[in-house]
Structure formats: C-alpha cells, structure tokens
C-alpha cells in the first residue's frame, strides 16, 4: 500500500490541552507521510510538518460526517476525549459511533481523559476501537511511523490485523519506557543546573510540536494535572497530580515555535497556578518567558486567587494579551466553600479590579457552574449579580454534572435539572448582552490580531482581546491572507476592517 494515498482523521473534544496534543500527533502523522483531515473542518493539510503555513481554521464546527476523503482511504481515526461532564462523554460516544459508521474499515484510536477512566466501556462500543489511557498518550508519538511501516509492508488494509498490531506495539512500548530523562540546559544565566525529572513528567509533555495544522495561533502546554480536590471535578482523577514542564524545556519549545514565524502563543495547562519548576512558580516562569521571547503571550486560564502582587505586574507587560479567562465557578461564598474552591467572592472582585487596572478594557471571561448541589435561588442570584457587576465579556455557563468518583457525586440536595437549565438560560442571556456591549465599546478603535485561515471564502481575525471578527479588505488588498499573519484592524460594528499587515509585530 502507498502511505501517501492513506489518510488519518483527527478529532478533538475538550480543552486546549487536548487540542495541543492532537496538533502534535497530526504533525507526526504528516512526517510519516499520511494525509490529515478532520470532520470538523474538512480536509486540513498534506503539507510537510516543517511548513509553518496554517491550512485549517481554529474554531471547530459542530460534529458532522465528513466527505472530505473516501472512507476506505482512512486507516486510522484518532479521537482525543474529555470527561469534564456527562455530556462531554456522551458527545465522545456519539462521535465514535459516527466514525465507526463513516470509516467501517479504520482503526478507531481513542485517548484522553475519558479513555483514561472508562477504557473498557469505550472498547465495548465496537470491535475496531482501541482505547488508550490518557496518561500514556506519550507513547502515541511512536504510532505514526509504525503505522506507516505497516501500511508500506501490506498489500491491502486488514482492520483486524492492523488493530492487533497497533495494540501489541503499544503494549510492548509500555514495558520499554526509560525510567528518567535528562532535560536540555537552557542558554540563559538565570536557569542553570537543570535537574533530572521523573518519567511521568517526561511522558505528559512528550506530545509537542511547534507546527500547527488546525490552529493559526500556537499552543504550548507547560503544566498538567491538578493537586486540588474540588468537589465536582473528575479531571484530576484522569490527569493525576500536578506536573510542570521544566523551565529550560519551556524556553526551548518557545524558541522552536518562534522560529516558525508565529506571532502569538497560548500557554496551556490544567491549572497554570500550580506550575512549579527550578525557577519557581508560574509568575517566575512568565517573567523568564517575557525575557526570552518577543511573541505575544496569551494565558489560557487563571484562578482568581492567583491574580496577586507577584503576577499582576507581569500581566501589565505589553506582550501579554489583554484577554483573561478566570475559573470562577460561583459568586456565592456558600457554594464556593462546598465546592472546595480556595477563594471567596471578594477575591474574584479584587482579581477583576487588578486586571482592569493593568490593562485597558481587557476581555475578561469566566467559567460558571449553575445548579451545584445545595445551590439555593439566593446563591444563584449572588452569582448572577456578580457576573453582571463585573461585566464579564464572556461567560461559559454550564449546568452541574455529577461525576463518578467525586465528592459532589453524592452531595445533597440535588438541584432539579429544570431549575439548573433556567439558571443557565438566564446566564447565557446576560452573557449575550455583555458580549455585545464589550464589542460596542471597541467600535471604531484600532487593535491588532492574528488572521485565521480562509473558510468558505471568508477570513476572520482573532484580536489581542479575543474578539473573533470577519475580516473586511478593500479591492486593492490581497484577496486572501495566510492564516497566522499579524494585522492591525479597525473594529467596525461586528466586523474588522484591515488597515495594515504588520511584518514585524514586535516593533
């Protein structure tokens, strides 16, 4: 079989960590000679992995069957799953069934948090499914090259043979993993004597690439896992204790990303507040990053109690994007205490005040859970009032989902789904109003951003403050810009009018 005539379909559900890891797997697949595509965006890329051009938009559309390539040409479907809510797992099962239906001869390789906790249940969905634990997904770095060899050595594709071979290969790899790895020394006087770190830390950061097929803006995972014990959260069970990428490796990976021509990078992690390395905590690492790169830095998520006197001055730096997403969850002290969150409502107000003090009208978003066990109407009204008073430009509101293995699984009294749904509806209506108000406040103003790759003849720009706007060009300007280009635009209603292509965004 000819590897170049075979394709691998990649699907990602959940957080930016999953997106980062899926991008890295995609880059390895292109290195091995496969074509890569996703049902979210259609055909993605056949360009070599060392080509920095981005060829697919960032925003994922709702799940749909793809007709991008004939199903018989797809030898593997890679699915990175999420377990944050019951609906996330339901969505994963639905996607897996769609893949089985669309690609009846392909191996369905499922990994991620859901696969870490429910591998047997996932494999029971169909004989062609191989569920691989999320905490061992580093071993997947070996799969593309191995699969390419299998394809090249085979006259035709036999699903049972390929599934058995991949399963055996992964099993064999688990017995041959070295016990420790040595990090590379960094060429910086403030980072020396890098220590050897354990195999789990090495594993969790193995999937990494400076090249991105599905995103116009780079992603860098610097932390994984969580040491907290929030009553509702199952992610800590799936990803384990907090681990961090050593500072030397952070800087090395940033250097590789910057060399591709990237103008912006998002730092990702399960809980960036728990980043620890030989240079100190997250604030110390951020300071070092700002000293060693000229790229714009976007921070994926922060806890309100981490917006303190050591971090705030760094967030004022001009390279830090004026966009902050806070893991808030509730505006009721009673509910926050029951959730085992390490802060109270006053801390949230203080954090938002500090962010607005150091940045000019930043985009501030928040995660909110409605319907947590015991949440009264008064508790919810406190949360709603906080969201209104703090004028969050984005609110990610979702109903409480009881997760097996968590303390909240058995907490009483349960809030009826109907009531939780009403609260979500009210929060979503507020979010829509405040989002529109935030956009209106920027009408007529200039701002910089990164262009997304064309989709259906239209391009969008993601501004520094996280506005996603259709890009308007006049007839004298280029018909299409490359995804990833850095531009200056003027906000005009719900659109962005191109005013300048910035060749050097650091000037």
What are these regions (language model features)?
Residues 1-268, 273, 310-313, 324, ...:
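Proteins enriched for Cys/Gly/acidic motifs involved in redox and nucleic-acid/cofactor modification
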Residues 108-109, 117, 258-380:
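Conserved SAM/AdoMet-binding glycine-rich loop
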């Amino acid at each position: 079989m000819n590897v170049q005539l075979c394709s691998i379909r990649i699907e990602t559900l959940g957080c930016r960590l999953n997106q980062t890891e899926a991008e890295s797997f995609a880059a390895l697949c292109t290195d091995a000679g496969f074509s890569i595509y996703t049902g979210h965006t259609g055909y993605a890329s056949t360009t070599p992995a060392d080509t920095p051009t981005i060829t697919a938009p960032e925003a994922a559309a709702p799940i749909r069957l793809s007709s991008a390539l004939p199903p018989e040409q797809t030898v593997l479907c890679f699915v990175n799953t999420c377990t944050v809510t019951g609906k996330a797992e339901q969505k994963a099962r639905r996607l897996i069934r769609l893949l089985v239906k669309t690609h009846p001869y392909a191996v369905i390789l499922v990994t991620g948090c859901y696969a870490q906790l429910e591998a047997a249940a996932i494999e029971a969905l169909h004989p062609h499914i191989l569920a691989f634990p999320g905490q061992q997904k580093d071993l997947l770095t070996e799969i593309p090259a191995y699969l390419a060899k299998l394809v090249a050595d085979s006259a035709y594709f036999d699903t049972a043979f390929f599934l058995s071979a991949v399963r055996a290969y992964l099993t064999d790899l688990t017995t041959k993993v070295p016990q420790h790895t040595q990090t590379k020394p960094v060429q910086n006087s403030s980072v020396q004597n890098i220590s050897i770190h354990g195999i789990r830390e090495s594993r969790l950061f193995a999937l990494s690439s400076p090249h991105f097929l599905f995103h116009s803006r780079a992603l860098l995972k610097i932390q994984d896992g969580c040491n907290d014990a929030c009553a509702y959260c199952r992610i800590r069970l799936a990803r384990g204790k907090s681990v961090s990428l050593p500072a030397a490796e952070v800087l090395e990976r940033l250097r590789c990303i910057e060399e591709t021509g990237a103008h912006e990078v998002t730092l990702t992690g399960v809980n960036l507040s728990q980043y620890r390395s030989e240079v100190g905590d997250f604030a110390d690492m951020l300071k070092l990053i700002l000293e060693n790169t000229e790229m714009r830095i976007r921070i994926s998520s922060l806890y309100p109690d981490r917006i303190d006197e050591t971090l705030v001055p760094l967030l004022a730096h001009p390279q830090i994007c004026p966009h902050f997403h806070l893991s808030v969850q509730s505006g009721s002290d009673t509910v926050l205490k029951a959730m085992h969150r390490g802060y109270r409502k006053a801390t949230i107000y203080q954090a938002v005040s500090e962010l607005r003090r150091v940045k000019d009208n930043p985009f501030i978003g928040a995660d909110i859970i409605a319907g947590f066990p015991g949440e009264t109407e008064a508790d919810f009204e406190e949360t709603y009032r906080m969201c209104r008073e703090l004028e969050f430009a984005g609110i990610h509101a979702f109903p409480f989902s009881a997760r097996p293995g968590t303390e909240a699984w058995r907490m009483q009294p349960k809030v009826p789904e109907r009531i939780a749904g009403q609260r979500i509806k009210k929060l979503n209506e507020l979010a829509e109003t405040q989002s529109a108000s935030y956009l209106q406040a920027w009408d007529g103003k200039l701002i910089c951003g990164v262009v997304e790759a064309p989709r259906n003849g239209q391009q969008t720009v993601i501004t520094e403050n996280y506005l996603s706007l259709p890009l308007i060009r006049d007839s004298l300007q280029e018909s299409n810009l490359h995804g990833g280009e850095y531009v200056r635009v003027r906000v005009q209603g719900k659109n962005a009018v191109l005013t300048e292509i910035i060749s050097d965004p650091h000037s």
